[in-house]
Amino acid sequence: MRELIRLVSSAGTGHFYTTDKNKRTKPEKIEIKKYDPVVRQHVIYKEAKIK
């Protein structure tokens, strides 16, 4: 059961990525380091629900 999620930048720029994850095997929230083009550096992105 894969669900769409949104990865929101912790830098506060409003930039986000969308992806999906398997809620059955990974029930915890995702935190991953990705590139934020607004601040032009790698920052931590945290999982949020798609509205």
UniProtKB/Swiss-Prot annotation:
Protein name in the entry: Large ribosomal subunit protein bL33
Q: Which domain of life is it from?
A: Bacteria
Q: How does it assemble?
A: Part of the 50S ribosomal subunit. Cross-links to the P and E site tRNAs.
Question: GO terms for molecular function, please?
Answer: structural constituent of ribosome; tRNA binding
SUPFAM superfamilies per record: Zn-binding ribosomal proteins
- Which gene produces this protein? rpmG
Tell me where the transmembrane regions lie.
Answer: none
HAMAP family noted in UniProt: Ribosomal_bL33
Pfam families, per the entry: Ribosomal_L33
Q: Is the Cytoplasm keyword given for this protein?
A: no
The miscellaneous remark of the record is: Surface exposed on the 50S subunit.
Q: Which GO terms describe its biological process?
A: translation
Q: Which PROSITE patterns match?
A: RIBOSOMAL_L33
Q: Which NCBIfam families match?
A: PRK00595.1, rpmG_bact
**Recorded GO CC terms:** cytosolic large ribosomal subunit
Similarity comment: Belongs to the bacterial ribosomal protein bL33 family.
Q: Which UniProt keywords apply?
A: Ribonucleoprotein, Ribosomal protein, RNA-binding, tRNA-binding
